[in-house]
Amino acid sequence: MQAEIKADIIVEAMEVLVNHILYVRGIYPSHIFKMKRMYNSPIYVSIFPPLNNYLAGVLKSAQELLRRRELQCLELIVYQKENEKLESYKMQLETQRSGLPAEDHLMEFEQNMRSVIYKISQRLNQAPKLPAGSCQFKVHLHTTQEAFIRFSHDSQYQEFPWLQTQKTESQATGRTVYLLPLARVDDLGLKMDVLIVN
């Protein structure tokens, strides 16, 4: 049961961060987001059904992988052309002791999440603007080979395709690459970095 609760907490944090990044970077028009309070902080969440359906499918898969301890990283990739990555946001999960954070750590977790949301807003508002209306995003779930095979054959996870990606070197020839460590939430073993190619 504790693994399920911990997975729920992490997936909720990932959902908040993905929505906030999409809003702050202007990947979708601001009018499809509504302000909500979470972690005692204002956040923006999508009210656009196609986007919500996509995110729900990704997060459902992430939650199951977390419960099985097979999720290594959730990566949000912003691109203009399929092979032209502009930004990459990696939420990495680090192996740690099992069990839930103690009650006092949940307060610390909430404070860390407030800090993360603030840092995302501050740091990404200073980043170069993305080309208006021409950017898209996709989410990659990094997992084990065994989990990939199991999920790609499980009918309840067939709402979107499971593809095995090839590791490619960044095609940033002649472009500046920025790596910004955004946050670390030690109690849950969650670390977030952003790679911005300009």
Swiss-Prot record:
Which InterPro entries does its entry note?
HORMA_dom (IPR003511), HORMA_dom_sf (IPR036570), Mad2-like (IPR045091)
Subunit description: Accessory subunit of the zeta DNA polymerase complex, which consists of the catalytic component PolZ1/DNApol-zeta and PolZ2/Rev7. Interacts with the apurinic/apyrimidinic (AP) endonuclease Rrp1 (via the N-terminus).
**Gene from which this protein is expressed:** PolZ2
S-S pairs: none
| Signal peptide from the UniProt entry | none
Give one GO biological process term: DNA repair
User: According to its UniProt record, which protein family does this protein belong to?
Assistant: Belongs to the MAD2 family.
Organism's domain of life? Eukaryota
Q: Entry's PROSITE patterns?
A: HORMA (PS50815)
Identify one Gene Ontology CC term for this UniProt entry. Answer: zeta DNA polymerase complex
Q: Which Pfam families match?
A: HORMA (PF02301)
> What function does this protein fulfil?
As the accessory component of the DNA polymerase zeta complex, involved in translesion DNA synthesis (TLS) and various DNA repair mechanisms. Promotes the apurinic/apyrimidinic (AP) endonuclease activity of Rrp1 and is therefore likely to be involved in the base excision repair (BER) pathway responsible for repair of DNA lesions. It does not appear to influence the synthesis activity of the catalytic component Dmpol-zeta.
> What is the protein name for this chain?
DNA polymerase zeta subunit 2
Q: Which UniProt keywords apply?
A: DNA damage, DNA repair
Give all residue intervals belonging to the HORMA domain.
4-196
